[in-house]
Regions:
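Switch I (effector-binding) loop of TRAFAC-class P-loop GTPase G-domains
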Residues: 45-71
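Conserved P-loop small GTPase signature centered on TRAFAC-class small GTPases
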Residues: 1-33, 37, 67-71, 127-216
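Conserved catalytic network of the ASCE P-loop NTPase/AAA+ motor domain
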Residues: 66-69, 90-95, 122-127
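Post-Walker A alpha-helix
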Residues: 40-41
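Switch II (G3) loop of P-loop NTPases
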Residues: 72-85
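Conserved Switch II/interswitch segment of TRAFAC-class P-loop GTPases
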Residues: 96-115, 125-128, 138-145, 170
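WD40-repeat beta-propellers
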Residues: 75-77, 103, 117
Length: 216
């Protein structure tokens, strides 16, 4: 289930009976129509809709995962891609532990916008935030306008993780989220960053400082 919010205030989520080791904030960004809502819906509830409405403001959902023996609750924010909602959505970048930047492989315009989204993300969050570039809708191969190699090269040039997905066919959806979340947990575990540190920084709207504890 997705919960809609058009306000720029922090949302308080219900806590599961078992307190997670890590409560992570993940944001999905990219142009309108690239499939962010369906990607999230497929990951959370294994559902896809051809009639998904354009996201207004911000929606979020949560999912609990076991990552290498760690209980992780991922709080995933689906942001609007339209310019008129930018002031609302950018407010939710603060305190993010990871991000996915989506483009549509059938739309070179959405691919060309990736650099803009990446710049905005890095200006609003910790510059070392874990980021995955996702080329969505690769079930529409006959309409492809962005080559696989173009996505790979852009990701490599900006030190991003990369996968192509199909929210419609559930291809690489689980893999994309798990790879991103796993990379965050591995980084925090390696550097001794605790769930309490992350929770405190998320409440304050800041990322865990990585000058001393860098994942790069």
């Amino acid at each position: 289930m997705l919960f809609r919010s058009q306000q720029s205030t922090s949302a308080i989520l219900p806590i599961d009976e078992a307190e997670p080791d890590y409560l992570l904030k993940i944001i999905l960004i990219g142009d309108s129509g690239v499939g962010k809502t369906n990607l999230l819906s497929q990951f959370i509830s294994h559902q896809f809709s051809d009639d998904t409405k354009t996201t207004i403001g911000v929606e979020f959902a949560t999912k609990s995962l076991n990552i290498n023996g760690k209980m992780v609750k991922a709080q995933i924010w689906d942001t609007a891609g339209q310019e008129r909602y930018r002031s609302i959505t950018s407010a939710y970048y603060k305190g993010a532990n990871g991000a996915m930047i989506l483009y549509d492989i059938t739309s070179s315009i959405s691919f060309n916008s990736v650099s803009k989204w990446l710049q905005e993300l890095r200006e609003s969050t910790d510059p070392n935030i874990a980021i995955m570039l996702v080329g969505n809708k690769n079930d529409q191969e006959e309409l492809r306008s962005v080559k696989l190699e173009e996505g790979k090269n852009l990701a490599e040039g900006n030190r991003l993780m990369f996968l192509e997905t199909s929210a419609k066919e559930a291809k690489n959806v689980e893999e994309a989220f798990h790879e991103l979340i796993n990379s965050i947990v591995e980084c925090y575990t390696k550097n001794g960053i605790t769930g309490k540190e992350i929770k405190r920084n998320n409440i304050q709207g800041t990322a865990v400082k990585k000058e001393e504890k860098s994942c790069c």
